[in-house]
Amino acid sequence: VAFSTDVDGNEIYTDGMTEDEKYAAALDAALGYFEAAGYTVTDGKLTAAPEGGRLECTATIPAGGSGDHPSFGILTAASEALKSIGFDMVINDLSDTSQLWDGINSGTIDMWCAAWSATPDPDMFQIYHSEGGSAKNYRIYQPELDELVMEGRTSTDQEYRKAVYKEALD
């Protein structure tokens, strides 16, 4: 539900926490991020969205209308977790994948999931660089990320690239 740090950058997990405690910590961190974005939080629930915000969104996934997708379980768990804090994430399971790409290209989809094969080379340009082919789909325009992606492309040393790409993904 949330990153491993809260909105202030503090670690939310400690050694010895149970899975239930970690889950609760993640939900609390998520509420902190929502509150920082202008949402109203009352008694551990989202109760109002800021101007221009909403308490619901639709996550679109091309899972054949039957949940047949590698990300479907994670998306379902996220939807349930968000619902528990007052945010409704509706899952739109498409049977026709072309509807996903049409929606992405027209900018009418709130959130989406897709899956594809990876290449043996961990090059991140196509997906994460502002000028990469998929960047418009992710709406990622971060100069720092672009620099790390380009830095990783300058070496054939796999350990070096792994460290640079880990930093980029963090």
Model regions: which residues?
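Solvent-exposed loop/turn segments at secondary-structure junctions
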Residues: 63-67, 96-98, 116-121, 169-170
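Extracellular/periplasmic catalytic domains that process cell-envelope and extracellular macromolecules
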Residues: 50-53, 104-107, 143
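Append "and occasionally in soluble cytosolic enzymes with long acidic Gly/Pro-rich linkers
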Residues: 1-80, 167
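A short secondary-structure junction motif
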Residues: 37-41, 119, 131
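Extracytoplasmic/peripheral linker and loop segments enriched in polar/acidic and small residues
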Residues: 23, 84-100, 125-170
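Short helices/loops that flank or line small-molecule/ion binding pockets
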Residues: 76-85, 98-109
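Paired acidic/hydrophobic, glycine-rich loop segments that form the ligand-binding mouth/hinge
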Residues: 110-114
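Proline- and acidic/polar-enriched loop/turn elements at helix boundaries
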Residues: 45-47, 94, 116
